Amino acid sequence: MSLSSHIQERLLTLDRGTGTAALKRLVLASGAEWYRDNPAERARLRDNLTAFGLPGDERMVDAAASNVMLHYYEKLLPLFCAPDAYASYLREHVSAGDALAALAEAHRAGTASLVAVSHFGAVELVTPTLALHGLPVSAVLRFTTPQLSEAAAEQARRFADSGRFAPVRFIEVGKPGVVAAMEMAAVVRRGGVLVSVFDERTEYSVPVSLLGRAVWGGAGLDRLMRLAGGRQRLCAAFMERTGDETYRLTTQEITGTDTPVQALVERLERMVRSHPEQWYFLHEEIPFVES
């Protein structure tokens, strides 16, 4: 059983009134249990760190495992919060500064924004933070279980109905009846805000260089840019963990390059070099080109 399924099986049935502190304790305890029972997964973290020339000592492996667990806490958190409570949580814990200014400007002008995110830091907080600040979002993702998919969609509707958040629509890759590429293209044509990952392999990915290794990346964002004919903004967005449930959102617009996917990956590389333990993808099988 994967870590995601292990945690969801135990926690999605909890009372929705479970407080954030209790939820966090339960996620961390469940994750620690899983890692104890699956030593090969700790070895995977170490192997992936060293494959990229990053520190692979026990302290770093412990930190990486802890950050993987926090990813699931941040993913589940909105399911256990009322809209007002989650809005207050984000306002109190997320520092956004002027990171949203360019996106807000593009939204007012009806210009499409491609918000490229990676498996780094508290990525699960990016979309709700955009929605909190009035940006309607279409988010491309995969839900590991139908139960989580249904719960997330229902909660997104509740959040939008509350007036605290702009609407969030999920484009679920691999869901029966969903042609994700066509739906992503439709968002771009409408001048919407599309949030999509760029550091994983799909049929549309291209080879890029990351930390001295050739990997697959982009997940089709370069194709969407060509479809938009330059009438869009592309930015890399990162939600860095800065402390105990404190976060900083940064966005970096990508312009003036013929290789936008490589430019995105270079932004990710800087973040990973600074905080390798926050790169969630260390938990996965890295999409090396040579493999």
Model-found features: residue ranges?
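Short acidic-hydrophobic, aromatic-tinged amphipathic segments that line or gate anion-handling sites
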Residues: 94-98, 168-176, 255
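Catalytic core of membrane glycerolipid acyltransferases/transacylases, capturing the structured
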Residues: 111-174
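Membrane-anchoring hydrophobic helices of lipid-metabolizing enzymes
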Residues: 1-117, 122, 159
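Alpha-helix termini
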Residues: 106, 159-163, 228-231
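Non-catalytic C-terminal accessory region of glycerolipid acyltransferases
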Residues: 132, 136, 174-291
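Short, basic, glycine/proline-bearing loop/turn elements
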Residues: 85-89, 165-172, 207-210, 253
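Short catalytic/ligand-binding loop motif for oxyanion handling, primarily in non-cytosolic enzymes
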Residues: 81, 123-125, 147-149, 203-206, ...
